[in-house]
Structures are given as structure tokens and as C-alpha cells.
Amino acid sequence: MSRGRIEKALSGFYYVNTGAETLQCRARGKFRREGMSPLVGDWVQVRDLGGGEGFVEAVEPRRNVFSRPAAANIDQLVILASAAIPVTEPYLIDRIAAIAALKGCQVLLCLNKCDLNTADELYDIYSHSALPVLRISAETGEGLAALRAAIAGKLNAFTGNSGVGKSSVLNRLLPELHLPVGEVSKALGRGRHTTRHVELFALGGGTYVIDTPGFSSFYTEEMDLELKAHLPETFPEFAPYVDQCRFTGCTHTKEKGCRVLQAVKDGDIPASRHRSYLRLYDELKDLRAWQKK
């Protein structure tokens, strides 16, 4: 039996890197009977059948699980946003960051295309937030050294809306990837996703990146009762203030004596971040247990 990590799952096959080789594996039927599937990022026990093939026999305990995109054991979610066309909506960033926080992941926001827009509204917002933010350019290489340092020694999942240059950034980090790069439509102001499946790549030194299909894949199960119950905790800027609110159970939406609202008014919490919180709160407030899939 060998131990390895799943780097790719495609058409019923799991590609497991054991350190010595990559095995093309099938999963035992017991996984299907137990209602679970091995995921990219999983550490697994595999039986080597020879000829580069094997069977996944067991999945080791996971530190976290994302069902969409299907990946496990993510240390850090790297959100790629665009400082130029197509400019990323702050709500999309905040929504994904909230899900990552719920899953126990670190979050890193990277604003690509900084060579095209130096007066960046997104940077103004997030440089005053609790989310770490980098300005980078896949075109010029600006900020990529800082990005490499920020992802070192971690399993990082990269995501971003179409057209932000995710594949271009990954190609700069690991040139041998040769990931396809799409173009941004001038008419629509958005790109077309070129990533079709989740795949893990090793950058060396214990650093790994997972390329995911993008923001749209993060919807559904993650937006559930658990996020509803812990929503304020997923906005780290709120942490210094939530225990100072006048009322226990304050929702930080409209209550008198809410210290979070006062911090927003005072400029200590970015108003844009709080607007995203309110939008998420409105989406989740009426969700009931029987509605959870």
C-alpha cells in the first residue's frame, strides 16, 4: 500500500502522486456505497496494480472539504480579481471570502492587471479591510515575488471570475503548465472560463496550487445554514466590535447600540464590506433546515 495525494479527478479516474510516480486509479465501490468520493487534494492510501494503475483504498481525514469546486485540504484560497476590465464586483469577493473563512481557510486577495489601472478602487477598499491584498500583473510580473512568498508551503486554491487572468498568473508561477488563456470580450466586458476541471500542481518546496473553474462553481451547498449561523465570524473586521454591541444576538444590520454599525460609520470597517454582509444576511435569513439539500 502506498500513500499519495490526488492531483486530478477526471472521468472516474483519480491521478495519485505517491512521490515516486503518478498512478491512474479507480476508487473502490465502498466509497460510492458510503456516499463519498475522493477529491483533489485528498491524501489517500492506494494499492499499486503495476503498469501505472491502482486502486484508491482509503481516504485520510480531511481538514476541510469543498463540494463545488470538488477539493479538500485547502490551506489558503487565493481570490484573483481584476483591477481593469472586467472589474470584479466586491460582493463576489466577499461572498467567496466568507465561504473560505467558514471552511477554515486563509484568504489572499490578488488584484491582477495593476499595470492597466493604478488608481484601483478595489485596492482602496481591501487595503482597509482585514483581508490581505496584493497588487500583481501577470503581464509585467509586478507583485509575483510577493505572491510566491504568500503561497509558499501551502496548498492554495486559485479562483476568480472569468477574464481576470487566473490562467495567465498560474502560467507565470509555473511556466511549464501552458494553461490555455482566454480573451476578454470588449462588448461584454468579461471573459470565458478556460479551466474545465479541478487540478493540483506542485510548485516545489511544499507549495501546491489548485486551479478551479471559477466563482460560479462556489454556489450551492456552501451557502447554507452553517454560514447563516456564523456569518458575522466570516467577516474578521467585525471581531473587535461584536462583543461590544448593546444587545445579545445583534445582527449588525440596524440595531441601536450596534458597535459594528458605529465602526462602519466611523470608517473603521469599509462600507463596501458591510454592504456585502447585509446582502448575504438577506439571502440567508429566511433559510430553514428543511430547505437544506
Residue ranges of model-derived segments:
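Short aromatic-glycine-enriched beta-strand elements
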Residues: 12-16
